[in-house]
Amino acid sequence: MDLEKFFDTVDHNKLISILNKEIKDGKVLSLIRKFLVSGVMVGEHMEETEIGTPQGGNLSPLLANIILNELDWELEKRKLKFVRYADDCIILVRSQKAAQRVMDSITKYIESKLLLKVNRKKSKIGRPIEIKYLGSTFYNQFKAKKYKAKAHEK
């Protein structure tokens, strides 16, 4: 599953509401909000950021992971097997029908609850012979029902 321009589209209010569940110190939340709107350099001038996490910011990967942790909990609640690293996610199911059902319902969850956009063109459903994920390719060996990994060549 692919999230469209993930780091650039994180909704600040949604992220702060998630953080507010665990962080009770308003000063910390205020500091995080200031970080989120601190802006980016475009050429020679600064532009304030209304959405997204500042690219290259030290907190950006952590804050992105916090919002996607909500997705992890939803997938676990549904007892789905998945692997996620940052905004790269693979969800494993047993059938094509289940895959379509999960894709539709998880897309709805991501877009309505997390206020993120799923890239439908890059998100795929299928029975893979090989899976490319995070720089490795996993090949299905049908007889043994195991996967072997091989690093991508750049």
Language-model segments: residues:
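Active-site and adjacent loop segments of nucleotide-processing enzymes
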Residues: 136-154
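Conserved polymerase palm-domain catalytic core
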Residues: 1-130, 136
